[in-house]
Amino acid sequence: MEQIMASTVLPMRFSMLLRTIDPIKFLWSGALFLGVLSIFILITKLPVHILRIFYPPVSVFVHVGLFIVYIVSASYQAGSDKSDPKHLQSGPPWYITKSCSVASNKDNIGYCQQAKALFGFTIIIIVLYFVEIIVSVHSCFVTKEEKAERDELREEKRTMKEYEDMVLRTPRTFPMMSPALPSGGTTQMMPTMSSRSPEFSTFGHGSSDLPLRDHFSTPNPRPPAQQESSETLAPGNQPQMYFPPPPKKAAKV
């Protein structure tokens, strides 16, 4: 008996609760909830797109859910206005089908414009999510060209990974060359110079291109290279030139 009474009382209380809910407040609360939900999803989609984990099936599921929710919101906004029992209106409300200037109270013109803007924004969002659903469904099917491009990128990454591992295992003996490209060509790079290479060991110990530095820095100065070449190539005995030349004696008058 108690179970039968409970089964009849609970639906009655639930129906009374639905009657006490103001449809206008419920509609505006739902619109506010949709706005917050949309902003949250937009903020979440940015890092997910950057990380490339927003896969097409997930995108289809998310956008279909948002599409359905906004369809329900638009149907409530364009539904019958029965908030005032004395002025029941079947069909879309007047603030959507008529101009806001027909309002008897001029203070309601601003609210009418807000309702129109909200309804138009809802329709735009529905169209946007419908387009995103189509794009997401199309992305679920990979073409042969896209599959070949993805395989080529994976092969290139695998080759680069193997080359890096080989360089890390043998850093001294392995030449600094770029890995083989998928097309078969290679790119030669300049060899590096370390503290154990011959070029580094002879750095600073060889002859300089400055003749005066080699001439005066050694114990036995030698003439510059240009002077030696001129002496060997010129015929006959020529007086030896010094640098700088000695001063000439002034002639007596």
Curated annotation (Swiss-Prot):
Transmembrane segments: 23-43, 53-73, 117-137
Ligase found in the keyword field: no
Annotated segments matching region Disordered: 174-253
Biased composition (Polar residues): 184-200, 226-240
Result of knocking out the encoding gene: Causes the inhibition in mycelium growth and induces conidia formation, corresponding with reduced expression of brlA and abaA. Results in elevated production of kojic acid, via increased expression of kojA, kojR and kojT.
Coiled-coil region: none
Keyword terms: Membrane, Transmembrane, Transmembrane helix
Pro residues: bias regions: 242-253
Subcellular location: Membrane
Predominant place of localization: membrane
Membrane-protein topology: Multi-pass membrane protein
Gene Ontology annotations for the cellular component aspect, listed alphabetically: membrane
Function recorded in the entry: Involved in mycelium growth and repression of conidia formation by affecting the expression of brlA and abaA. Acts as a negative regulation factor for kojic acid production through affecting the expression of kojA, kojR and kojT.
Protein name: Kojic acid related protein 1
Organism this protein belongs to: Aspergillus oryzae (strain ATCC 42149 / RIB 40) (Yellow koji mold)
Name of the gene encoding the protein in the UniProt record: kap1
